Amino acid sequence: HVRGEVGRKLVHVTVGMYVAFWPYFMSWQEIRVMCVAFFLVVLVSQRLNTFKAIHEVKRKTHGELLFPVGILIASLLASTELVFTVAVLHLALADGFAAIFGTIYGERRHYRVFSYKKSVVGTITFLVISFLLIGYVVLMQGSSYALANIWIVIWLPLIAAFMENVGVLGTDNVLVPLVVVAGLNTLQLI
């Protein structure tokens, strides 16, 4: 089970890191077309049982189908390329490494959300990575800007982690980027 979940999440991390930077060399329209194509490829691969690494999971999930949907939503709602990048990096890094570390190191300390097992290690991993991503974006805007907007560095990672926890069956792949985009869109990012 560990090998399958870790392999699946490594694909999640790798693809997400690549996709996060699409706006810097593709148009929004091209990104949206790629998301629809990505969705269709995953749907067909489920039916034909190809790409076993992303489908090899014992629990019920629609995460692999909702991953491109979350990216599509981010592309539709993000006010800037940076907002899109940070939202998708939450899927790739925060969610991906939370699952990897939670699977490997989180067996001893866990809790349940809607009868789904979540690990303390995974949630802390998500929070730390989210804090670093949001903190970096806010700091990039300048020190006076960062001081004025420190609230988002504190609250947005907590809200995103909450959404990751309640987003069962893979719905976190839509909820997390939606919350991150909404939170960062409230800021006037350069």
Regions found by a protein language model. Give the residues of each.
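Interhelical loop and helix-boundary elements at the membrane-water interface
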Residues: 1-31, 43-190
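N-terminal, motif-rich segments that launch catalysis or mediate targeting to/interaction with membranes
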Residues: 32-39
